């Protein structure tokens, strides 16, 4: 029998890609989204074009509305909670809205799951920002990047949480509540502390989704500003690999419930945000890219890459799409869909 999925933020980048995958399988899907992001209507159009307007249930609503999310969750077998405020910079300028969307919105969604009486699986998209600046970890500067001096495989889940920036705090609140609902209420919940996720259907902007944003800006001739020294290192993970991890956790929920997993490309898929990504982008574009420079932004880690060994051991998961292959796929999608931007 087909499972009933509730995807909050289902019209967003990760959400729409997962909805597409689920509809291909014949799942029953409810997309729950407030459509506040510019790309959301375009992602819905894509889903309707591929599967038909009646292929999924659409609820235009906000997770800050406890009554609406409780109603949406009543029959859900799986809840994938992706909705929220996603930019560190926005959290600094408007911390109240950030807290309401991420902390209260996640609490409302957890309560909806708990009170449904349906024992749903609950997947939560957390963030590596919960680790904060990792000031106790030594980093080393090379010609094109910063890197960890001692964490050869990257940051493990045992790294102390430090919650820098209002965004890190609000997502961290959700992170800890999701874990505790597994302990206290037996909710079958899983936390994924996600690194930089990228891929098609990502309408990146300067404040969030840097890899997609720079690709879109380069292809469409928009100005790119590099903040900090451009050597900040991130591990990048293609969205298809992330969705494989969601699938693995759902399939192995007896193992995964109550667990936290770092979810990123790991040490083999790291990239300096401009010192290394810039030349790759220029090669794909076939020309030099002029950029502006500005100072460091709040909460911007010099280094982050995840040790995903726990997910590999417990879920049998690891990334399949290499960095250069994935970036080339994203570049081609942007080139072929310039009218969307």
Locate the predicted segments by residue.
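N-terminal Rossmann-like NAD(P)+-binding domain of SDR-like oxidoreductases, especially those catalyzing
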Residues: 1-197, 317, 329, 337
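C-terminal substrate-binding subdomain of Rossmann-fold SDR/epimerase-dehydratase oxidoreductases
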Residues: 18, 61, 196, 216-341
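Activation loop
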Residues: 40-43, 87, 207-210, 214, ...
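Short aromatic-enriched loop/helix-cap "lid" or pocket-rim segments at secondary-structure transitions
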Residues: 41-44, 133-138, 202-206, 273-276, ...
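Residue-level signal for the nucleotide or nucleotide-sugar donor/cofactor binding architecture
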Residues: 64, 93, 101-104, 158, ...
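Residue-level recognition of oxygen-bearing side chains
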Residues: 68, 78, 97, 104, ...
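A conserved pocket-lining segment of Rossmann-fold NAD(P)-dependent short-chain dehydrogenase/reductase
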Residues: 91, 150-165, 189-203, 213-237, ...
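Non-catalytic, surface-exposed connector residues within folded enzymatic/regulatory domains
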Residues: 92, 124-125, 191, 204-208, ...
């Amino acid at each position: 029998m087909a499972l009933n999925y509730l995807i909050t933020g289902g019209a967003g980048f990760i959400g729409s890609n997962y909805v597409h995958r689920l509809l291909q399988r014949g799942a029953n899907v409810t997309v729950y989204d407030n459509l506040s992001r510019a790309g959301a209507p375009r992602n819905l159009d894509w889903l309707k074009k591929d599967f038909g307007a009646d292929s999924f249930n659409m609820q235009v609503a906000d997770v800050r509305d406890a009554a609406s999310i409780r109603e949406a969750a009543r029959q859900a077998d799986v809840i994938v909670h992706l909705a929220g405020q996603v930019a560190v910079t926005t959290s600094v300028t408007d911390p109240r809205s950030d807290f309401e969307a991420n902390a209260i919105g996640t609490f409302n969604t957890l309560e909806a799951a708990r009170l449904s009486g349906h024992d749903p699986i609950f997947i939560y998209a957390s963030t590596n920002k919960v680790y904060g600046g990792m000031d106790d970890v030594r980093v080393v500067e090379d010609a094109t990047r910063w890197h960890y001096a001692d964490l050869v495989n990257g940051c493990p889940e045992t790294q102390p949480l430090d919650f820098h920036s209002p965004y890190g705090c609000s997502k961290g609140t959700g992170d800890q509540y999701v874990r505790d609902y597994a302990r206290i209420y037996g909710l079958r919940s899983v936390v994924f502390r996600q690194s930089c996720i990228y891929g098609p259907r990502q309408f990146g902007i300067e404040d969030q989704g840097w890899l997609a944003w720079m690709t879109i800006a380069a292809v469409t001739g928009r100005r790119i500003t590099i903040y900090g020294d451009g050597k900040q290192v991130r591990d990048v993970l293609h969205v298809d690999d992330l969705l494989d991890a969601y699938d693995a956790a759902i399939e192995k929920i007896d193992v995964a419930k109550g667990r936290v997993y770092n979810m990123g490309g790991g040490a083999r898929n790291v990239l300096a945000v401009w010192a290394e990504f810039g030349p790759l982008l220029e090669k794909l574009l076939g020309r030099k890219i002029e950029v502006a420079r500005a100072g460091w932004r709040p909460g911007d880690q010099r280094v982050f890459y995840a040790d995903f060994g726990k997910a590999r051991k417990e879920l049998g998961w690891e990334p399949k799409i290499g960095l250069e292959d994935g970036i080339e796929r994203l570049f081609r999608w942007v080139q072929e869909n310039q009218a969307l931007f």
